[in-house]
């Protein structure tokens, strides 16, 4: 929104979604229309998702579940941009979650816990969200500009009283939304429930990945093959698939990723066995 106003001419925007149940496409279109952007929608299928999986893992250098899931859509939309446009520099929104809160940080037991979690997530960015953005974009000869990652901005936001970031307003990321009140974005976009990127592409994408992994291993094969890994042992067939692809390209290097990205399981409401916000009790309207 800021770029569109500052440039004074239509910007190029891109959105990606599954062919059967994309969530964010309609909202991206509304925002693009409001900003008078030159907007492109990239539609993908189950076959596209499965075919992209191995090159995504090879590019990322991770076995982490949520990083790989979220990278599929970004990888494919960046590939489209490289192959079909002359755009080579992208604005992307990484790091707003770490600064202003995830869905699961609604369950933070207090301001100090919220702040400590934000600090942890920022320290680990290079293994998760920033890894995803950097690799998915650069592997297609594109460059990223990450405004939320500006060091002055990060320091400013982290100096705000964390009590003001707690979701006591009935809406996550309240401070960030409030900052864009006015004519920056339509209210329907500004105040809608956020969906995680891997979910917003369409719930079917993660479901397809899980089903594909289930088709590759019997229960016995899964147990035997997962047991080979002492570090960050795969705990689902999906995580085993990702680990085996990782080991194909980065054998014996699993320890460069600290752990599976998960909500803070020590918090009430966050003791879950899947990183998706879909499994949280507060998911609500995020999937609509």
Enumerate the predicted regions with their spans.
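ATP-dependent adenylate-handling active sites, centered on carboxylate activation for C-N bond formation
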Residues: 1-184, 199-212, 224-235, 239-288
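Conserved S-adenosyl-L-methionine
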Residues: 185-196
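Surface/interface-facing alpha-helical segments and adjacent flexible terminal/loop regions used
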Residues: 216-221
